[in-house]
Amino acid sequence: MNEEYDVIVLGTGLTECILSGIMSVNGKKVLHMDRNPYYGGESASITPLEDLYKRFNIPGAPPASMGRGRDWNVDLIPKFLMANGQLVKMLLFTEVTRYLDFKVTEGSFVYKGGKIYKVPSTEAEALASSLMGLFEKRRFRKFLVYVANFDENDPRTFEGVDPKKTAMREVYKKFDLGQDVIDFTGHALALYRTDDYLDQPCCETINRIKLYSESLARYGKSPYLYPLYGLGELPQGFARLSAIYGGTYMLNKPIEEIIVQNGKVIGVKSEGEIARCKQLICDPSYVKDRVEKVGQVIRVICILSHPIKNTSDANSCQIIIPQNQVNRKSDIYVCMISSAHNVAAQGKYIAIASTTVETKEPEKEIRPALELLKPIEQKFVSISDLLVPKDLGTDSQIFISRTYDATTHFETTCGDIKDIYKRMTGSEFDFEEMKRKKNDIYGED
């Protein structure tokens, strides 16, 4: 270990593993360590089930009705991949897809007036949906056609809207959309967690709705994908990529000290040995003095023996509870997967509810989601701090990832990856850069 590296990475969360993979593909010498004996950090999938009980201090062993412990891979964070989103692009460009199998999530649902409705995924479904009345549907369709044709580089598609100046609120007004439809569009399609976006320039929102529509168009049932065997497979896929390009991996490595000289990182000490480096990437848990708390997320993992009611017995789905519906500032999310994804014993379902904490009683805040899941066989509650780096890391060359937020997709995580990449290299993140070199040594399939 007493060697000189270009980059040392601490923690094997998704952000760290993707950056480690990209740096290795770009010819950097990378050492990647984790204090845990497993991959994934905060974004791990826990197996066997007994380990989940231990992690959440639940007394006793899982009951026999839960089946074999090793049939379970339980994600600590609830996320899906947008079929046309940035993470899927990263997987395709790096060919990490060869190590993974995905399934399309069966449906996306939205909560309105105490009930859940399917988010329409085809024009026929939209016309039949009881989410909105007939005239509202016509106006909404006009709005969707406008969004589909919109191109921020072609003023002919603007129809009097200035993408950099016109607020999204004004665009909704232009199409005469009602409050329910605005809630549904902003939260179930554009996937905003709060309503702050209404007063921002509309370009970002329109592009988010386009991403949703394009993702949906790829597979038809919903815009979301989920990897077999759980989200923990994602960091492992990128770790394999890094290893193929000469990256060195060490799990179960206690990190004793990050060594800084004249304000700049020069190495990492583990088990009495020092590995030197020019740059360091890590998650917040390795540098508690360099991050600050900006909020909290509550997540409740629920084991069920039944699909969620009113989802047409879907074996996987997402439910969004828009904040307006439950008098909150932030949305509540539910992600549900099942034995169909090799993450649970036969006939069992895992539903994870999450939201940004707004009060002193987070468990009360998440109750509307838990009501939809009843009866719940076993639940595991966690409240995590949202941590962000105090500085950009350009002086110390210590680049710290953000903790995973309450959203149910990876678009914000990909934004963080691109941001760190730019700070580390001084150049914009380019998907082409991630392409495997044509004459490289391919990993075994």
From Swiss-Prot:
Q: Could you tell me the superkingdom of the organism this chain comes from? A: Eukaryota
Locate the N-acetylmethionine modifications and list their residues: 1
Name the predominant localization.
Answer: cytoplasm
Q: Which gene encodes it?
A: GDI2
InterPro entries per the UniProt record, alphabetical: FAD/NAD-bd_sf, GDP_dissociation_inhibitor, RabGDI
User: GO CC terms for this protein?
Assistant: cytosol; Golgi apparatus; membrane
Record's function text: GDP-dissociation inhibitor preventing the GDP to GTP exchange of most Rab proteins. By keeping these small GTPases in their inactive GDP-bound form regulates intracellular membrane trafficking. Negatively regulates protein transport to the cilium and ciliogenesis through the inhibition of RAB8A.
What keyword terms does UniProt attach to this protein?
A: Acetylation, Cytoplasm, Golgi apparatus, GTPase activation, Membrane, Phosphoprotein
Q: What is this protein called?
A: Rab GDP dissociation inhibitor beta
N6-acetyllysine sites (modified residues):
112, 269
Membership in a protein family: Belongs to the Rab GDI family.
Q: Which residues carry this modification: Phosphoserine?
A: 130, 382
Query: What GO terms are given for molecular function?
Result: GTPase activator activity; Rab GDP-dissociation inhibitor activity
A Pfam short name: GDI
Q: How is it placed in the membrane, per its record?
A: Peripheral membrane protein
Q: Where in the cell is it found?
A: Cytoplasm; Membrane; Golgi apparatus, trans-Golgi network
Its GO biological process terms? Answer: negative regulation of cilium assembly; negative regulation of protein localization to cilium; protein transport; small GTPase-mediated signal transduction; vesicle-mediated transport
> Subunit composition?
Interacts with RHOH. Interacts with the GDP-bound inactive forms of RAB3A, RAB3B, RAB3C, RAB5A, RAB5B, RAB5C, RAB8A, RAB8B, RAB10, RAB12, RAB35, and RAB43; binds RAB3D to a lesser extent. Interacts with DZIP1; this interaction negatively regulates the interaction of GDI2 with GDP-bound RAB8A.
